[in-house]
Amino acid sequence: MRWLIFICTSLFLFTLPLAAEDKVKVIDGDTIHVGKLKYRFLGIDAPEMDQVCKKNQQDIMCGVIAKNALIEKINNSPVTCKIEEVDRYKRLVAECFVKEESLSRYLVRNGYAVAYRRYSIKFVEDEEYAKQNQLGLWSMTFDYPWDHRAKLRSK
């Protein structure tokens, strides 16, 4: 029952701008911390921090690039998050915004992340745009983040 109250309260509270004193810390290309809360972006999957992509036979740390793109996009601006659910890792799965622009949409549309169809189809059109324009990941050879994680688990 407490979880239900927490979730209902959170759905209301966290659609408001997060407190200015709650500094946003970017963990990777699809996860941020705000204060003590951890937000996993809804419907997208960004490369892992250790993930290497290839472009013109050169290794590119595409997870680091995704994280840096998110840091640059947020740029100390206020972040607003709309919580959709709590995942099995107790992360708040949310769509977060800067200046009313979806960070998930920005990351996928610019090729820093892919649509995570297993959980949502909301950003599939944005992925198609990035793919057609060979933006970000789509200008490289890469493993989908979930395939990269599976390879690591199988070792």
Which role does the model predict for each range below?
Residues 2-8, 14-155:
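Small beta-barrel nucleic-acid-binding modules, primarily SNase/OB-fold domains
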